Curated annotation (Swiss-Prot):
Basic and acidic residues composition-biased segments: 182-196, 209-218, 265-274, 292-303
Stretch list, region Disordered: 10-79, 91-141, 182-257, 265-284, 289-326
Protein name as annotated: Putative uncharacterized protein DDB_G0274405
GO cellular-component term (any): nucleus
Basic residues bias spans: 311-320
Species, as recorded: Dictyostelium discoideum (Social amoeba)
GO terms of biological process kind: box C/D snoRNP assembly
Bias (Low complexity): 14-24, 46-79, 93-124, 221-257
One GO molecular-function entry: RNA binding
């Protein structure tokens, strides 16, 4: 129903006030009434038609409303079903999500456990591999030893009986029996007489060349200087003793004779050590008159400077300490000397034998000359 239809219904249905018409004739009244009734009928028909139309419209509207309500109900039912299904789906989805999360967590845990197991397995495998490598190395060494032993056996099998007999003879020769030891000693003595240097096989017994020889030489020179200084002091003491007892003329003669006699004694000792053949020869001592011909050399007296400066004394008494540098063996055996040690020793022995031969020849010649001189005398 529209609003216009409702307004017409309300306007038609309102009772109008009855107006008393003026008094007229009956015929006129009847005519008027008939006309009014016609109008009313016509209006009533129109109203009924309108009402019927309105009712039809209302029925249609109601039907439409019912249809709409049914549709709405169906939609509501459908919506309820949908909501129920949605809730169910949501619940299902939530459950599925929870299950998926749980499954993922379980999978992660399983993966972590598998990783840990894999790491442990790898560690164990690494340890086993190390052991296996060690075992493999040991096995390889054992194989090498076995191969080496097999080769030795093959070599021994391939050896002929002549080689074995030769080997046994060499062993018998080198065996340290009494006869072999005595023969070796004789060979060493002959080599020493020849002038050969004997080198033992023991490398520890061999003295290495070191720069300590310089120190030994310095010590020897210092000792010789000390000896010479002591001899000089003895000579001066003898001269002072003789001068105190005798005259100045006799002092010079005695000092010169003492000095000459000491020098001659030293020379004679050296000659005795060098030449054993000339021990019985007479020693000629010069007379004192020959030495008196030489001019006398005055002995200089050394004066001690007592007024020397303190600085010099301090420097002499307190010399600066020289830093001792680490000693380095300059004479180290090279690889060449180590490799060719036997050849070098053999060459040295030959060179020494040559020098020995020359020295013996020279001594023989000198001895023959001296014998000839004695025969002539």
């Amino acid at each position: 129903m529209d609003l216009s239809d409702l307004v017409q219904l309300y306007s038609d249905g309102i009772p109008q006030p009855t107006i008393t018409p003026p008094t007229q004739n009956k015929d006129e009244l009847n005519k008027n009434n008939n006309n009014k009734n016609k109008i009313i009928r016509h209006k009533g028909g129109n109203k009924n038609n309108r009402n019927n139309k309105n009712n039809v419209d209302n029925n249609n509207n109601n039907n439409n409303n019912n249809n709409n309500n049914e549709k709405q109900n169906q939609t509501n039912v459908n919506n309820e079903k949908i909501t129920n299904t949605e809730t169910l789906e949501i619940k299902k989805n939530n459950n599925n999500n929870n299950n998926n999360n749980n499954n993922n967590n379980n999978n992660n845990n399983n993966n972590n456990n598998n990783k840990n197991k894999y790491n442990k397995f790898n560690d164990n495998n690494n340890k086993k591999n190390k052991r296996n490598n060690d075992d493999d190395d040991d096995k390889e060494e054992m194989k090498r030893i076995k191969l080496f032993n097999q080769r030795l056996k093959e070599i021994k099998i391939q050896e002929s009986p002549e080689d074995i007999a030769r080997y046994l003879e060499e062993r018998r020769r080198r065996y340290p029996s009494k006869a072999n030891i005595e023969a070796k000693k004789k060979e060493e003595e002959d080599a020493r007489k020849r002038g050969e240097l004997l080198y033992n096989n023991n490398n520890n017994s061999k003295k290495k060349q070191t720069p300590d020889k310089k120190k030994k030489l310095e010590n020897q020179t210092s000792k010789n200087n000390n000896k010479s200084s002591t001899t000089k002091t003895e000579l001066t003491n003898t001269t002072t003793n003789t001068s105190s007892t005798t005259n100045p003329t006799t002092d010079t003669t005695t000092t010169t004779t003492n000095v000459v006699s000491i020098q001659k004694e030293n020379e004679n000792q050296e000659k005795e050590n060098n030449d054993n053949d000339n021990d019985n020869e007479p020693i000629e001592v010069p007379s004192t008159l020959e030495f008196n011909k030489f001019e006398e050399k005055p002995i200089k007296e050394v004066k001690v400077n007592t007024a020397s400066s303190n600085k010099r004394n301090k420097k002499r008494n307190n010399p600066k300490k020289v830093k001792e540098e680490p000693q380095v063996n300059k004479f180290q055996d090279s690889l060449f000397t180590k490799l060719f040690e036997r050849d070098i020793s053999a060459e040295n022995n030959i060179i020494l034998q040559c020098f020995r031969h020359f020295a013996n020849k020279i001594n023989q010649i000198n001895g023959n000359d001296k014998l000839d001189e004695k025969k002539e005398i």
